[in-house]
Amino acid sequence: MNRIEQQFKKSPAYVAYLTAGDGGLERSLESLLALAKGGVNILEVGVPFSDPVADGPVIQEASIRALAQGTTLHDVLTLITSFRQHSEIPIILFTYFNPLLAAGDKIYQQMKSAGVDGCLVVDLPVEEAAPHLTACKTAKIAPILLISPSTTQERLKKINEHGEGMLYYVCRPGTTGVRATLPENFPAKMNQIKSMTSLPIVTGFGIANRKMAAQALQYADGFVIGSLFVKAIAEGISKNALTRLAQSLNPHYPNP
């Protein structure tokens, strides 16, 4: 049982995303630790990429800044190695496929050695993912797969068969970014998905406040907040303020 599975046995998942290298690797380490201190219990560490088609403007701009500072996939793994000296909470590497492809087959074992627990490749459909899935499982890294509102039952069966750790439900079409409410069809979609899988389901793409997080947890096993944190980091939020922000968004934390 890996750290992701252990976490879901303890409590619902509060997942935070940040783009590694935005503001420098030291700043990223500081931010990861601040988020963990604020109650985040799973971290998604984003590998900056030059064509992040699934991401909205906030995360696209973070990728541009991180790449401008020379951040590479190996730098991201060094960051995770440093984080592992301080914390054992699960880490999911959030990436596009090209950086993995460019790094070669050894990258999966390097990911495992750095302390990565799961890998989510945002632009790799399950139908084309066989080599990636095999490499993940050989390295004992959970392949985290995506579901969307348009995922068919047949495709969901395939995703359920190959995914591990958890499934990530993208609760609305389009790119990442802050939204005001969850989609109206969210409860029905979640119930449909849950009837077809025993894996925990987290949901994201737009959750931006405590109320939305609480609503998500009525149906999902966890929620993801990304753009809000990325924007705050870009604006120079202090590590203590980032911890307080994370606490303020957590439905299980006492009201701020």
From Swiss-Prot:
HAMAP family: Trp_synth_alpha (MF_00131). CDD domains: Tryptophan_synthase_alpha (cd04724). The active site is at E44 (proton acceptor), D55 (proton acceptor). NCBIfam families: trpA. Its EC number is 4.2.1.20. InterPro entries: Aldolase_TIM, RibuloseP-bd_barrel, Trp_synthase_alpha_AS, Trp_synthase_suA. It holds the Pfam family Trp_syntA. Belongs to the TrpA family. It is an enzyme of class 4 (lyase). It comes from Coxiella burnetii (strain CbuK_Q154). Keywords: Amino-acid biosynthesis, Aromatic amino acid biosynthesis, Lyase, Tryptophan biosynthesis. The alpha subunit is responsible for the aldol cleavage of indoleglycerol phosphate to indole and glyceraldehyde 3-phosphate. It comes from the Bacteria. The keyword Ribonucleoprotein does not apply. One of its GO terms (molecular function) is tryptophan synthase activity. Transmembrane segments: none annotated. Tetramer of two alpha and two beta chains. It catalyses: (1S,2R)-1-C-(indol-3-yl)glycerol 3-phosphate + L-serine = D-glyceraldehyde 3-phosphate + L-tryptophan + H2O. This is Tryptophan synthase alpha chain.
